[in-house]
Amino acid sequence: MASGGSKSVASILLALNLVLYFIVIVIASWAMNHGIQRSREAASVLTTPARIFPIYFPMGNMTTGFFIIFTLIAGVVGFTTSITGLNNIFQWNAPNLDAAAMSSLTTWALTLLAMGFACKEIELGWTDSNLRTLEIITIIVSATQLLCTSVIHVGASEVTLQRIARV
């Protein structure tokens, strides 16, 4: 009975994370494309060390490049983890839940790294509305990924205990 509750909560959280990570990918991809297109003209007026630096974005502040790159990586990994996690949750056996738990933990670690850059970007300021949206969604998805990781770990331990009790 308890594993059914964990299964439904994990499915809902994985579906929510799938949507949130897709939004993160779309906004971070737009920001990356915008930065690549505008960096040549914006960086031409800078001094030599700043022109050579490959992670210069004409919007935001000095953490914007790192924030966008790590958010894009976390978004792609999180989207993939959510898709495979839904498959693993629907099968609901120990090996699949262990795989879902480990990939969920890895995704949460990457999302926390992106969230750290989001917090630094918020602290420094000077960001436009698109970057503020990406920062907020990154912070929200790190919290939902923590909940999802916790629920999957609870479900994996329940299935393992049930398997041990049967033997």
Over which residues does each language-model region extend?
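Signature of small four-pass
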Residues: S3-V24, A28, G60-A118, E135-G155
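Juxtamembrane "helix-exit" motif on the non-cytosolic side of transmembrane helices
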Residues: C119-E123
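Short amphipathic alpha-helical interaction segments
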Residues: A101-S104, G125, S129
